[in-house]
Amino acid sequence: MNSQQCVIIGIAGASASGKSLIAKTIYEELCRDLGTDQIGVIAEDAYYRDQSHLSMEERVKTNYDHPKAMDHELLAQHLRSLKEGDSVEIPVYSYTEHTRMSDTRTMTPKKVIILEGILLLTDPHLRDLMDASVFMDTPLDICFLRRLTRDVAERGRTMESVISQYQKTVRPMFLQFIEPSKQYADIIVPRGGKNRIATDILKARIQHLLAK
């Protein structure tokens, strides 16, 4: 598989802005056209840096909304390998242990790779690897309420810890890093992951790139 046959789409935006939902929708709908083995989804969260050498007390203090928390170098390396036709081992990250697990997830080369993550557009090397980029422009108060519900229900967090993290790092880092990265997006999507028109536009763009 050569680089022209691998279309990489990056979907960025605030935590709980609808990135995973629109990525899932596009994945499922393109799978019907291309087959499940031709499309892959990679979450930026899998590339949080390994913290196994730190105590749990130290891990919970990490600023997970700062670009330095991400191993973007490894992600870029994996994307280049996939474009060159090689399989990669994607890290598995634990939200409860706040570090990588020993397991990995094998991804084989795909025709379409959908990236989703809060800080994707802050890295120029990742932007250079993308064929199209998206920013989910969902109001921050809505994102916070979604995040609060999700993290308590799915990630073993307390309500107090989620609120504290939002005040200390999530909102400040959004304003400092994530929101400014919107300028690099090819498509800006309002109203969250259920925006049908935006989904159709993005699918059409992917299909156009595949037809080249």
Swiss-Prot record:
Identify which top EC class this enzyme belongs to. Answer: transferase
Determine the domain of life of the protein's source.
Bacteria
**GO cellular component terms, semicolon-separated:** cytoplasm
Stated name of the protein: Uridine kinase
**Is the keyword Amino-acid biosynthesis assigned to this protein?**
no
Q: Which InterPro entries match?
A: P-loop_NTPase (IPR027417), PRK/URK (IPR006083), Uridine_kinase (IPR026008), Uridine_kinase-like (IPR000764)
Listed under catalytic activity are: uridine + ATP = UMP + ADP + H(+); cytidine + ATP = CMP + ADP + H(+)
Family the entry assigns: Belongs to the uridine kinase family.
Compartment(s): Cytoplasm
Pathway named in the protein's UniProt entry: Pyrimidine metabolism; CTP biosynthesis via salvage pathway; CTP from cytidine: step 1/3; Pyrimidine metabolism; UMP biosynthesis via salvage pathway; UMP from uridine: step 1/1
GO biological process per UniProt: CTP salvage; UMP salvage
Query: What gene is behind this protein?
Result: udk
A molecular function (GO) held by this record is: ATP binding
Write out the entry's keywords from A to Z.
ATP-binding, Cytoplasm, Kinase, Nucleotide-binding, Transferase
Give the taxonomic lineage as stored in the record: Bacteria, Pseudomonadati, Pseudomonadota, Gammaproteobacteria, Alteromonadales
The record's annotation in Pfam families points to: PRK
